[in-house]
Amino acid sequence: MTGCSPVFTMQQVVGVSHRLVWRTFRGTDLLMTRTLCSPGPSRPGEKRPEAAALGLYHRLPELGRTLSHTIRNQAASTAKAWWDRYEEFVGLNEVREAQGNVTEAEKVFMVARGLVREAREDLEAQQTKLKEVRDRLDRVSREDNQYLELATLEHRMLQEEKRLRIAYLRAEDSEREKFSLFSAAVRESHEKERTRAERTKNWSLIGSVLGALIGVAGSTYVNRVRLQELKALLLEAQKGPVSLQEAIREQASSYSLQQKDLQNLMVDLRGLVHVGQDQGSGSPTGPSSPRGKDIDGLSAAMKEQLNHSRQVYSCLEGLREQLDSLEKTCSQMAGVVRLAKVPAHPGMVEPLDGALPSSLLEHGSTMLALSEMEQRLEAQANRNAISSTLVTCVTFMATLPLLYMLFKTS
């Protein structure tokens, strides 16, 4: 096989250019060399973006833990501050301080009791020893040399007994003093506890009274708003039929005028037709007179009037539908009025399941019922306002003496 078959080789050396060589079997280079520059050395103080991002990624958990710890400490400190304010306002700090004083006084009293017990035991032991010495002294003769030693020992033991008795009496006085301090601390603690209970009861009573007043005021406001909305609906219901009836009257008056014009036109047309027939019988072959043009004009006017009458009729049909819907609404309102009249007039109760009487659908009776309903609602609103005001005043006047007595006792 003859000819040159190309072989591609890539030589890559660090810091040396890349060369793409096209060699033949004879080893002759046939392709040019392309040199590439290696990246320069980086600065010693400069950080790569990858390293910075990796360091930030590793620091994120620690930052999250630090932030959560800071937030938790801040929330705990805020809650503790508010709780301390609440305890100071209620009086728990004073009660806790009084209980601490009671505990300290109890410890001091118990120490004093221990000292008294030890002094009594020492005095009793000294008295026992003194009794033994006296017994021995009674059994020994006064001429004996041991009598002087026993007398000296008795004298020394009497002095020791006197010292122990004085110490015992002082311990008893100290015990009584510590007991009085302990009793005073207990009484103070009980007084602080009773004061805190009274203060809590007073504030709870004041809060309940204020809550009742706020509830009464809120219910009064809500009732007033509802009554105003219902009054506005009644006013809208009153204004609706009046405007619609005025529109119906206007359309009816225009329709009656158009009917009169149409009747006059028909009368004129009949007269013209009779005149034309008379002229046709007198001169059947004569040329058309100006009367023919008048007849054409009148026929065109009549067609226009008929079209206008049809439009008016369609408008009246639409108004009739609206009037039907309005009558249904008025019937519903009349039913509501009758239901409202039931508590005031028990003898006027009638069945509402069937069709309402025709008199309730009339405009005058409906307007009268709506006006009565409006007056009844206004009277009810006034009664509710007066009753709520009276209840508030009576409650306030009843709580004033109680609050005065509570604060006076506290």
UniProtKB/Swiss-Prot annotation:
Reported regulation of activity: Channel activity inhibited by ATP via ABCB8/MITOSUR subunit.
GO annotation terms (biological process): cell volume homeostasis; mitochondrial potassium ion transmembrane transport; potassium ion transmembrane transport
UniProt GO MF annotations: mitochondrial ATP-gated potassium channel activity
Region (Disordered): 276-296
Subcellular compartments: Mitochondrion inner membrane
Key words of the record: Coiled coil, Ion channel, Ion transport, Membrane, Mitochondrion, Mitochondrion inner membrane, Potassium, Potassium channel, Potassium transport, Transit peptide, Transmembrane, Transmembrane helix, Transport
Residues in compartment: Mitochondrial matrix: 36-201, 407-410
GO CC terms: mitochondrial ATP-gated potassium channel complex; mitochondrial inner membrane; potassium channel complex
Ranges per topology, Mitochondrial intermembrane: 223-385
The keyword Cell inner membrane appears for this protein: no
Primary location group: mitochondrion
Membrane topology reported for the UniProt record: Multi-pass membrane protein
Entry coiled-coil feature ranges: 116-143
TM region positions: 202-222, 386-406
Organelle targeting sequence: 1-35
Catalytic activity: K(+)(in) = K(+)(out)
InterPro entries given in the database record: CCDC51
Low complexity: bias regions: 280-290
Described function: Pore-forming subunit of the mitochondrial ATP-gated potassium channel (mitoK(ATP)). Together with ATP-binding subunit ABCB8/MITOSUR of the mitoK(ATP) channel, mediates ATP-dependent K(+) currents across the mitochondrial inner membrane. An increase in ATP intracellular levels closes the channel, inhibiting K(+) transport, whereas a decrease in ATP levels enhances K(+) uptake in the mitochondrial matrix. May contribute to the homeostatic control of cellular metabolism under stress conditions by regulating the mitochondrial matrix volume.
Subunit annotation: The mitochondrial potassium channel (mitoK(ATP)) forms a heteromultimer.
UniProt protein name: Mitochondrial potassium channel
The encoding gene: Ccdc51
